[in-house]
A protein has these predicted regions:
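Alpha-helical cap/lid subdomain in secreted, periplasmic
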Residues: 45, 55, 71-210
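Active-site phosphate/pyrophosphate-handling residues
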Residues: 6, 41, 188
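N-terminal signal peptide c-region/cleavage motif recognized by signal peptidases
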Residues: 13-15
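Serine-esterase "nucleophile elbow" of acetyl-processing enzymes
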Residues: 17-65, 75-83
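Bacterial N-terminal signal peptides that target proteins for export
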Residues: 1-5
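N-terminal helical cap/lid subdomain that shapes the substrate entry/recognition surface
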Residues: 66-70
């Protein structure tokens, strides 16, 4: 009897193992894995990285090639199912390519973050930077969008998804890490991007309250 009581007390005092979490990677072709074999895409590589680093998580691919922030907002509610614990939000690249007014992109991202916040779902916002050829006003507005939203919603943000893929000698995206289109990373580039983002994703998952 004493032995049984001791076992019960020991189990009660032991730390409980966390449930497996669900992380939604929500974005465009960078998330979806455009131009890559499935296993080499961003989501499978992130899943492998997180598992190797001890995270009990399933990463779901909610990337749609060509999606804008408006498109993302239109499908965001479908993604917010009860099993979603955290979101990695990477949208805005196609808005940039199309020259969409940053004010519109900001409003769409704001609406998505508002929805996530209402459900207490932690979000990591993946930032981007506009090139100078859009003009100084456009660039300033676009570049400020991500840090401003992160500050408003008190969420973490990455400065620039592509920063780890830049050749520091040329200050341009490394051709060794990019597909021939110059817009999407190749398998090697995906690994570099995942290695850069991974620690922040671990921090995001640590904020989940089950």
């Amino acid at each position: 009897m004493i032995r049984n009581v001791a076992i019960v007390l020991t189990l009660a005092a032991s730390p409980s193992y966390a449930e497996k979490l669900t992380l939604v990677a929500f974005g465009d072709s960078l998330t979806q894995g455009y131009g890559l074999p499935q296993a080499d895409g961003f989501v499978p590589q992130l899943q492998s990285w997180l598992t190797a680093n001890g995270a009990e998580v399933t990463v779901l691919n909610a990337g749609v090639s060509g999606d804008t922030t408006a498109g993302g907002l239109a499908r965001f509610d479908w993604t917010l199912t009860p099993d979603v614990d955290a979101i990695l939000l990477n949208l805005g690249g196609n808005d940039l390519l199309r020259g969409i007014d940053p004010a519109s992109s900001r409003a769409n991202l704001d609406a998505m973050l508002t929805k996530a916040q209402a459900l207490n779902i932690p979000v990591l916002l993946v930032g981007l930077r506009a090139p100078g050829n859009y003009g100084p006003g456009f660039k300033a507005d676009f570049d400020a969008m991500y840090p401003d939203l992160a500050a408003k919603f008190n969420i973490p943000v990455t400065d620039n998804y592509f920063f780890p893929l830049i050749d520091q000698a040329t200050r341009l995206l490394s051709t060794d890490l990019m597909q021939p289109d110059g817009l999407h990373p190749n398998p090697k580039g995906v690994i570099v991007a995942v290695n850069a983002l991974g620690p922040q994703v671990l921090d995001l998952l640590a904020k989940v309250k089950k």
